[in-house]
Every structure is written in structure tokens, then in C-alpha cells.
Amino acid sequence: MKGKHKIVVKNNRLHYEFEIKRNITIIKGDSATGKTTLINMIRQFANLGNASGIEIECDAPCTVLEGNMWQMLLKNLSGNIIFIDEENQFIRQQEFAELVKASDNYFVIITRENLYNLPYSVEEIYGLYSSGKYQNTKQIYQEMYHIYPLNQDLSCKPEKIIVEDTNSGYEYFKAISKEKNIVCESAGGKTKIFAMLEQLKAETESICVIADGAAIGPEMDALYKMSVEKGNIKLYLPESFEWIILSSELLEDKEIKDIMDKPENYIESQEYFSWERFYTKLLVDKTAGTYLKYQKGKLNPTYLHEKNKNKILNNIKNSIDL
């Protein structure tokens, strides 16, 4: 499944309207914000159809997954937008993560917990809020909003950079940092970033964390709270290092530009568990047999040649001051 899908769920009192474009969307938030009501309305429509007094507008079937038979039900669903409430304990199981990975459905999961088995994007974590009455009717209009701000102010110059892993992205930022006399360290994986920051709690220097936004959703709650609490910690969360290169126009390729404009139209959810994997394959394929041949595990030195290095840097200068 791929593409952006608009969903409208409404009755004579409530009107939910939102769009989803990735395989996993998370809806968080406090009680009494309408999350469970949304699930109930979709369930009622599935059971009663028009007799429920509920209307659903979407170009894909919307269904609720729940109960003890969830595995069998999920295996038989294809091309659906599947809604799941947090009361279903199976969303925390590794088996569920494996079935999501192999599925060609989109999933909208309502949960206040962080689901560490799933690589969901920081951009697809939402809350629900009532934005008033709908078009002069008595309907309450429910919309989604991003829980975490996507455009953090990173204008300060970092004195230390922490990169998520030890792959090509780390090698690139380490080389840039050395030129700028900035300390650059690897956390050794996204799950280790918070622990590394905990060890630096007493420090007052400006720290910038660089991690793949495409999959860091489960860790975001703790990282964001720490960045707000400390003030000297900033989060730079592009989709991935490969995304930075592809969107820098270092490769003058029209197809790449078209893909980067609307990636959701090209990324098949059953093939790519997270968008980061798609961007890696795209960059590897597009640079194969060229002087810019890309390997995720080790940086090709040509990316550090002055012209290439600056092209990439110019793409991130509005996000991080290096």
C-alpha cells in the first residue's frame, strides 16, 4: 500500500478529518480527547453500515483490528487502513511488529505508550483536538496535530554533536565537526541516545542530536522532554542521512526530485518497514557504478570533496549551524 489517504469519519455530532501517508500512524494524548470515540465509530459503521448513522469517506477500506483472533484477521486483510486501540495488548508484541512489517496495510494505532518494536516516524505522531463547529452545523470538528514540533529552532552553534549510529552519516558529520573544532560522538544506536544524554546532564555546552526521524518515534517522548527540560539539547531529525543527500540535489536527477516531492506515492509499505530503508536503496541504486557510489556502512570519501560536502551542508544549514 502506498500514497496519501484522506479519512473522514462523521455522524451528526462529530466530524473527524485527517490524512495519513505512512504505514504506521500513532495517535497519542490524554483521556477525553476523542481517540476511543473514533475507533468506536469505525467499528459501529463496520457492524451496522448506514444504519449506524455514521459516514466514512476514504479511498481505502477502514477497519478495526481487535480481539483474540487478531493474527488471523490481520493475515487476511490487504489494502486496508487498520485502526487499533491501546487496550489491545498485542500491539506490544514482537509478533505484531513482524506482521505489520509484512503487511500491505496502513496502521493507525491509538496508544499513550511508546511501541519500541515498531519503527515509526516522529512526523506521524499526532494528538486530536476539537477545532470548533463544522461549517455552521452542530458537529464538533476533530483534527490531528503533531505532538512534537517539526521545526525546532536549531540556530545555536553546537559545541558537541551526537549522531545516532556509526554508519556513513556519522563519518560525514565527524569529518565536518573536526573541521569546525566540534566534538562528534556516536550513540551506537537510537535506543542508546537517551542514556548518553543522561551522562551529559551536568554539562552546559550546546549539544545537537542527529538521528533518523523516519524511525525514532518510540524514543521521541524521552528525548523531547529532556531537550525541553535542559534547554541546551537540540534535536535535528531528518528522515535519514540518505534523505539529506538525495534532497540536496547533489545528484542531478529528475526522478529523484519527483520522488522527494511526494515520497508517499513511491514507497510501498509492504516492501519498506520504514522510509529510511527506501531512501537508502534509492541512493544506492542511483549512485551504483558512479564516483558517488554509496554504501551505508562506510562513507565514500568523494562525499567529503569540497563541492560535494558543501552541497550537502547547504541543504541542512537552515536546520543546524555547522
Segments predicted by a language model, with ranges:
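Hydrophobic anchor at the beta1->P-loop junction of P-loop NTPases
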Residues: 27
